């Protein structure tokens, strides 16, 4: 039996204000709140809210047979709480259906998994706690930033107790193999891997309303027929898109919401089912092995990290940012911790890309770099004031060790407290 795994990803960065060199050391607030609020409300009203309402209708109309997953960064949830609480309400309603899986993702939508393992673990923990507090759900499956995957990352995730990760079904990794099955990681056989079907996902994201595309006009019945026609034995079809596909990339006038709402009817009529990622890895056995020693993502033509790390500007920003990670981990200053998380957002790096900046407020990659580095310089000064570089590495390591031991002790006590309450 063929199963469809639909995932929708929600994230947007905080808008940075124009921050000039002479403000370094004087102005410690880096964000354009008005622009952020305006953008978040536009996302919610045009895309996210109508999408969530459509998903709820799909669950109800299918009598609970429609299942899907949503990936939301911690910073995105923060923005919903601050600027558009109606989104929190609809997400709670979806969580209550038990038909929607909410995925584990880095809190700040960062590259921490590549640059600082401790930071990545913290972010996954923070985001998981936020999902549990706000929505009452426990994240089981990992959607790393931009579907980032490496063998080493899969191994580290396995040590953390996770059993499944999502990534891109890129041709240079798959070769002749189909993405429509469950894989296991070459680095950790217990770690199951689901792969995005690039072609079928892009049918919705980029080609749905393109009159020059071979499958135009697309409708739910035609799409269901395409899925049904896939070879026997391809049991899980992973269609994962940015949530903004619905209402923004493909505006409501294209019929994209009607298409989505009708899909369960035509799929179920053809005896196809719907699964969340957690259900897929639980019910389906791994049939092949995935190996990718180098970063694999869903970004750009190369499906790697080059969009974010491919030039000297991006490398300088990343190296300077993560050079202070251990010192930031020592800090207790709430504002500093908040800035640390927000400044790791990969979208700021994307703005520094010479080739593909996408939609941006900056005139050039260099303009984006200068603005970000001015902000980063002020942030680094703040870190230096709290934990100067004059502190020897040995002393720093001892402080970190003490803090980690305290964190572990607190965690053990909290676990005992939870058991006692039960």
Which residues are covered by each model-predicted region?
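Active-site and substrate-binding clefts of carbohydrate-active enzymes
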Residues: 1-47, 181-191, 195, 210-213, ...
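Short, well-structured secondary-structure segments
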Residues: 3-8, 14-116, 140-143, 163-168, ...
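Generic structural signal for well-ordered alpha-helices
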Residues: 52-56, 88-92, 121-131, 154, ...
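Distinct, well-ordered alpha-helical segments
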Residues: 81-84, 150-158
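Acidic, His- and aromatic-enriched active-site or binding-groove loops in soluble protein domains
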Residues: 87-104, 137, 158-178, 183-195
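Short, charged, surface-exposed secondary-structure boundary motifs
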Residues: 113-115, 173-181, 203-205, 286
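CE4/NodB-like, metal-dependent polysaccharide N-deacetylase domain
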Residues: 119-146, 225-240
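Short His-Asn-centered micro-motif
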Residues: 143-147, 167-169, 195-196, 240-242
